[in-house]
């Protein structure tokens, strides 16, 4: 009896993590619609991000306090433009490459938050990363296990960077925030 309950619980967990609670057949049937929606979102988010990075780069040129951020925003702009160009060249039905491009976009956003929150501002709290940690999983439809893996990966990278680059007075608060916001995400 106990083995049966455990097996049922494992099946429910597998169904939840791999198929978002749906039946595998239903999940497979809606994948084309999910990819079309993700592609539209990726195009919109990349275009918005590029416009935002242009504004940040130009704005940083005008504010002496932000001069150090110019290369970071310029690199993010170049990466965003590159991803946008690749996305526009993809055939409509190439799902696997689209997924990799979604991961690359998420990685770029997380990396920007980690870099700005740890290396660029070692004596301040890393608020940008926590905002990205909460928002990025909501941008695209993916299997829940992939969202969880991404959050754990980048939260772990952030924690390593915090202990490596941050001022000792800020480390406890950033570690606590990373654990709380990582769990929420």
Task: Please place each PLM-identified region on the residue numbering.
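Non-catalytic regulatory/interaction regions at protein termini and inter-domain linkers
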Residues: 1-37, 129
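Hydrophobic transmembrane alpha-helices and their membrane-interface boundaries in multi-pass
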Residues: 44-136, 154-157
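Transmembrane helix interruption/hinge and helix-loop junction motifs
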Residues: 64-65, 120-122, 141-146, 165-169
């Amino acid at each position: 009896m106990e083995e049966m309950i455990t097996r049922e619980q494992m099946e429910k967990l597998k169904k939840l993590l791999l198929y978002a609670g749906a039946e595998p057949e239903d999940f497979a049937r809606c994948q084309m619609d999910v990819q079309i929606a993700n592609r539209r979102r990726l195009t919109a988010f990349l275009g918005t991000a590029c416009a935002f990075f242009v504004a940040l780069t130009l704005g940083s040129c005008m504010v002496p306090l932000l001069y150090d951020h110019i290369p970071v925003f310029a690199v993010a702009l170049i990466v965003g433009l590159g991803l946008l160009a690749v996305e526009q060249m993809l055939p409509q039905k190439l799902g696997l490459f689209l997924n990799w491009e979604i991961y690359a976009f998420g990685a770029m956003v997380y990396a920007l938050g980690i870099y700005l929150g740890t290396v660029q501002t070692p004596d301040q709290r890393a608020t940008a990363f926590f905002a990205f940690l909460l928002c990025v999983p909501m941008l695209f439809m993916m299997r829940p296990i992939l969202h969880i893996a991404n959050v754990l990966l980048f939260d772990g990278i952030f924690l390593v960077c915090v202990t490596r680059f941050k001022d000792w007075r800020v480390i406890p608060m950033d570690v606590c925030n990373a654990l709380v916001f990582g769990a929420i995400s």
